[in-house]
A protein has these predicted regions:
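N-terminal pre-catalytic "stem/leader" segment of glycosyltransferase-like enzymes
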Residues: 7-20, 24-27, 32, 36, ...
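Conserved catalytic-core segment of nucleotide-activated headgroup transferases in glycan assembly
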Residues: 247-256, 368-470
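Catalytic core of nucleotide-activated saccharide and alditol-phosphate transferases
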Residues: 294-423
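Catalytic binding pocket for nucleotide-activated donors in carbohydrate/polymer assembly enzymes
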Residues: 473-579
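Extracellular disulfide-stabilized recognition modules
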Residues: 595-614
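Folded, disulfide-stabilized extracellular/luminal domains of secretory-pathway proteins
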Residues: 608-678
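Short, structured beta-strand segments at or near domain termini in extracellular proteins/domains
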Residues: 676-709
Length: 709
């Protein structure tokens, strides 16, 4: 009898399999017939059968996945008698809270478990889930919150929105399936706006997924809240007028696209619910509740919105009266940062420093930068791509050669105007060429500003560029471009970076590049991060005016003959995942009370009275700490100032970027009257700043010691 039962089940399986294959064949034939008379090719237009082969490949892959899932199911039905019994779908992983997207495709259910303790604490949860299972289609609002008929979506909604179920019954999971992410990156206008981003994500995916797996082993990655996140890339929209999409493969600026690529990878791998758009017209469709200014913020279908300044402007125009209630949800990608003085619209107007980029009146921490140059903003960063591992880099034979940092001819020309010596870069490079062969990677055919002795390779792909860097001993900075990713790539490949020093510092008054940018930063070198946080022996910051110093530096590098790869943890995939996870879990810009900030914790903060004329940024750095603007509020009073062994002649309140502070001439104690102007970077010759300084993890500046989660 058991054998007959087995034969019957095998017969059913074969019959079901043949039926699926037959139906699949009919579907493919119908699709082919429907599109058979259409024009094919990449320029055939929008409503054509372009690349039917790719479509078929996707369909076939989907069929195979479905067949495999059916085999797993039938294997259970037939008591495991099938030969290809490759997995036990009833087995439970110890880390059940982390479900892979591919597992969901294979039919393994997401772990959303109600324990007995949960049921006791939330007695209405089960009955509400039952109601949801019957009624979730009764109103479209449930689907807008992500309810899709699954138990997990019910629990997520009932915990996050209505509070009837425990949040711990589900946790943010990591997703490792690349195909699912690629489905989010399809340009509805067929402009291939995401093309470069898709290529970078795909190329780096194995490293990203490995980093996510390593990080998931830490306790602080469990029980994370899952967020609904809208990502709008304003710079890629047609309305931006910047033509980023059109120029992404023509030598155009890629720094912003690097950051967007890595942010999208990070958010996806951390398991959040993503909506991605580059269409200005689609904004309202993703924010239906934003039309009215009086609706509750809780009714919005998103928790966080990532965009750029262009996108922020588009949001303001599109949603008009509804903007105010969700402005606190914004996180703005802002490469060079926005300082409080420029962000505060009225203050900027009064002081005649208002720019087209500034005056947003957001909290300064809502601006996310590429490098940690201003503690008032949040450091998002990016990932330095690595084509070779450290052992490969160390084993590569280095040649007596150097590579110049400058992929466009105009970059070599710009460097002429950064220094006072008349013969410019040629005199500087002439010194170096006496010791090493000089190579370049300059695009195009016209190289008017490139010295004849430079061996130019043109624009190289990533693998070839990293190979060239790993074979070279020195990476030569010309002074421009400012703060790019290339020096970090060179250092990661073991090359020593010569970082041009600026005397006097570059700023928005003496450099056309910074004119109009909402910052008064003083760039002391081409790459301040490399100068301040990496330094020797990987980075030598020298004045290109001083040719003797240049010569001695090159000799020192070659004599030491040590070329070890180095990459700060914060610029690795794992480092970015850790940092962004901490931000997402702890940063809340929609709390408007004056309570002491819980994150970073108060235990990580040291109050320091700076010398007159020095900013809190510099005061904290000298103590090997970072200025922490979240903790200015508890220092903004007379008691906190007098704790520094000072006696106030009188107390006054004022609105400027220098306070809280002590005036060394008048003995006055001055507190901040406008919290939006609390600033790490303000300084005044007569004032001693009272500074909240925090510890930081070397190689992970955004996080304090002990607050990695």
């Amino acid at each position: 009898m058991p054998m007959a039962h087995q034969d019957f089940n095998s017969l059913c399986y074969t019959s079901s399999l043949m039926e699926i294959i037959r139906l699949s064949e009919e579907y493919v034939k119908a699709l082919a017939n429907e599109n058979g008379n259409m024009v094919d090719g990449p320029y055939a237009g929008r409503f054509t059968a372009y690349d039917l082969k790719k479509t078929m490949a996707v369909l076939l892959e989907s069929m195979l996945e479905r067949l495999h899932r059916l085999e797993n199911f039938l294997n259970v039905v037939t008591n495991g008698t099938m030969l290809n019994n490759t997995q036990n779908i009833s087995s439970k992983d110890k880390q059940a809270s982390f479900i892979l997207a591919k597992d969901l495709i294979m039919g393994i259910k997401e772990e959303c478990i109600l324990t007995e303790e949960d049921i006791k604490m939330y007695p209405n949860c089960r009955s509400k889930m039952y109601w949801m299972s019957k009624m979730w289609k009764s109103d479209n609002c449930y689907a807008s919150y992500g309810v899709d008929g699954s138990d997990c979506s019910f629990i997520m909604y009932l915990s996050e929105v209505e509070g009837f179920c425990p949040k711990k019954a589900w946790s943010g999971s990591k997703q490792l399936n690349l195909n699912s992410l690629m489905q989010l990156l399809i340009d509805p206008n067929e402009r291939q706006g995401y093309a470069w981003i898709r290529m970078r994500i795909t190329r780096m995916w194995s490293r990203w997924s490995a980093a996510a797996t390593r990080l998931s082993k830490h306790d602080y990655m469990a029980n994370r809240s899952k967020k609904k996140i809208l990502v709008h890339l304003g710079l890629l929209s047609k309305q931006s007028g910047w033509k980023f999409a059109e120029n992404q493969f023509k030598g155009g600026p890629l720094g912003e696209l690097v950051q967007w690529s890595d942010l999208i990878s990070t958010l996806y791998l951390l398991g959040h619910d993503l909506t991605i758009t580059i269409s200005y017209l689609l904004i309202l469709s993703h924010l239906p509740a934003a039309k009215s200014p009086c609706q509750s913020r809780k009714e919005l279908p998103v928790h966080i919105i990532y965009t750029d300044i262009v996108g922020l402007t588009q949001f303001k125009k599109r949603v008009k009266g509804g903007y105010g209630k969700f402005s606190c949800l914004f996180r703005i990608l802002d490469s060079f940062g926005t300082e409080p003085a420029f962000n505060h619209r009225n203050f900027a107007k009064q002081n005649k420093i208002l720019t087209s980029w500034g005056g947003q009146d957001l909290l300064p921490r809502q601006f996310f930068t590429m490098f940690p140059h201003s503690p008032d903003n949040s450091f998002m960063g990016f990932v330095v791509e690595q084509h070779l591992n450290n052992s490969d880099v160390r084993s590569t034979d280095r040649k007596q050669q150097a590579v110049v940092y400058g992929k466009n001819d105009y970059m070599w020309k710009v460097s002429l105007f950064l220094y006072r010596f008349h013969k410019g870069k040629e005199k500087y490079l002439d010194v170096i060429k006496d010791f090493v062969e000089i190579h370049g990677t300059v695009a195009g055919d016209k190289h008017e500003n490139v010295p004849k002795y430079v061996i130019n390779h043109g624009i190289l792909n990533g693998a070839d560029l990293h190979k060239l860097l790993s074979e070279s001993k020195i990476f030569i900075g010309l002074g421009f471009p400012f703060e790019g990713p290339a020096p970090l790539e060179a250092i990661a490949n073991g090359a020593i970076y010569i970082n041009p020093k600026f005397i006097p510092p570059i700023n928005n008054k003496n450099s056309p590049f910074f004119k109009g940018k909402p910052t008064q930063r003083q760039l002391t070198s081409q790459h301040p991060y490399a100068e301040e946080f990496i330094g020797e022996p990987h980075v030598y910051t020298v004045s290109l005016d001083n040719l003797t110093e240049v010569k001695e530096t090159v000799q020192k590098i070659l004599n030491k003959n040590e070329f070890k790869p180095y990459l700060p943890y914060e610029y690795t995939e794992e480092g970015m995942l850790q940092r962004m996870n901490a931000y997402i879990q702890h940063q809340d810009f929609c709390q408007f009370d004056a309570k002491i900030s819980k994150w970073p914790p108060l235990e990580a903060i040291t109050t320091v009275l700076g010398p007159a004329g020095k900013s809190c940024r510099d005061t904290c750095l000298e103590k090997n700490m970072i200025c922490e603007p979240n903790h200015f509020l508890e220092l903004n009073n007379q008691e906190a100032i007098e704790k520094q062994s000072l006696k106030c002649s009188n107390m006054i309140k004022s609105s400027n970027i220098y306070y809280p502070a002590y005036n060394i001439k008048t003995k006055q104690c001055i507190t901040q009257a406008d919290n939006l102007l609390l600033s790490c970077v303000g300084n005044n010759e007569q004032l001693q700043r009272l500074c909240p300084c925090r510890s930081y993890i070397k190689g992970q500046i955004a996080l304090c010691i002990g607050c990695e989660w």
